[in-house]
């Protein structure tokens, strides 16, 4: 583990990672970049993509988390998985699982941290409104045309992340 990013809208509380000196440590100190706020902050999303992509190109694993919950990191993960072509059903399931819902199906939040744009369904509707034949194309449109991420970076990321398992062989029937 050589890379760590913490999504945080407070001032930097730490200058280093608790995981050790050999772990690079970044704080996403950009306020709310969750849900609908991503459409207001394309430069911030592009910056976070570039940090992640830089580590990817170096072959460095990246551990990232939110300091107060899951909304900001869940939204960034949605963008990453979306551009990789994860199905809409799986995108929604991953996002739902990251919410650690209570028995009533709702994640209880501190009222102090509520944001009026906390609407996952609205994010998906907005992404789906972009041009493209597939949901993956629509996520790519958002990252490339709205945020200014390089299409070649996205393609290289896909090629590196979606690798067929060349060692897998179908099980042969026993004779």
Give the ranges of each region predicted by the language model.
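Ser/Thr-glycine-rich phosphate-binding loops at phosphate-binding pockets of nucleotides
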Residues: 68-73
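Cys-dependent protein tyrosine phosphatase-like superfamily
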Residues: 1-63, 75-175
